[in-house]
Regions:
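Conserved glycine-rich cofactor-binding loop
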Residues: 9-10
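Conserved glycine-rich Rossmann-like NAD(P)H-binding loop of the short-chain dehydrogenase/reductase
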Residues: 23-39
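The beta1-alpha1 cofactor-binding region of Rossmann-like NAD(H)/NADP(H)-dependent oxidoreductases
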Residues: 34, 57-68, 100
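Substrate-binding pocket helix/loop in short-chain dehydrogenase/reductase
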Residues: 94-95, 99-104
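Active-site helix of classical SDR
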Residues: 118, 154
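Residue(s) in the substrate-gating loop at a strand-loop-helix junction
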Residues: 138
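C-terminal helical subdomain
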Residues: 171, 178, 194-233
Length: 233
């Protein structure tokens, strides 16, 4: 089985990659940082079972580069069973104060890149009448919060893309799952003054995501909401 995970060198993406590989999946990892990808490849391919890890340096904020990556995957991999659109960006700011261009930059990575990558890979899945697409959205996909202007807009839109794909892909046997995690530990939190149990470990989110791939073809998990036990920050 072959899985494609974008934004897969840290946080939720890396945790998902490791969980999949530990369960026998071969994985394709992508990031803008080639050194990080090389480190991930060594880590993944050292796991029991000798999983393969295909790495590619990609800037998903560029449409043409995203499409080229998808086309390369179709040539390199024997099939694509699972696509996890995880790459994303967050720029804090309110709609009326954020810099000009922040919305466009945020939408390019959080919405347009999964849109174009999914469209590139879908014909292969549809031809096989088999596949699974998982979009890593956010609790910001259904609720707004202060200082989350462009990010909230982009994540609402990503959930809309997921819902549209879910309806379109039912006849083709392709499952579509939207995952809405709350605050999850990652490097982006830096030295944030929170105790360990205030944010979720990415491994918990990864376990939930990967669990949806174990179901029979008769079942589909449409949406998952996972939050810190103590609630949102």
């Amino acid at each position: 089985m072959y899985a494609v995970v974008t934004g897969s060198t840290k946080g939720i993406g890396l945790a998902v990659l490791r969980q999949l590989a530990s369960e026998g999946w071969n994985v394709a990892a992508s990031s803008r940082n080639h050194e990080d990808l090389q480190r991930v490849k060594l880590d993944i391919e050292s796991l029991p079972g000798n999983p393969k890890c295909f790495i590619h340096t990609v800037d998903f904020s560029h449409k043409e580069e995203t499409i080229r990556y998808g086309q390369h995957l179709l040539e390199e991999l024997p099939q694509i069973d699972l696509l996890i659109n995880n790459a994303g960006v967050f720029y804090p700011g309110s709609v009326h104060q954020e810099d000009d261009g922040v919305l466009e930059d945020t939408m390019a990575l959080n919405l347009f890149s999964p849109y174009h990558l999914t469209r590139t890979l879908l014909p292969s899945m549809m031809g096989r009448r088999k596949g699974h697409i998982i979009n890593v959205c956010s609790i910001a996909s259904f609720m707004a919060y202060p200082n989350g202007g462009a990010y909230t807009i982009s994540k609402f839109a990503l959930l809309g893309l997921s819902k549209a794909l879910r309806e379109e892909m039912k006849p083709y046997g392709i499952r579509v799952t939207s995952v809405m995690p709350g605050a999850t530990w990652s490097a982006s939190w830096g030295d944030a003054p929170y105790p360990d149990d205030r944010l979720m470990p990415p491994e918990d989110v990864a376990e939930i995501i990967v669990s949806t791939t174990r179901l029979s073809a008769a079942s589909a998990v449409e949406e998952i909401i996972i939050r810190p036990q103590l609630g949102d920050l």
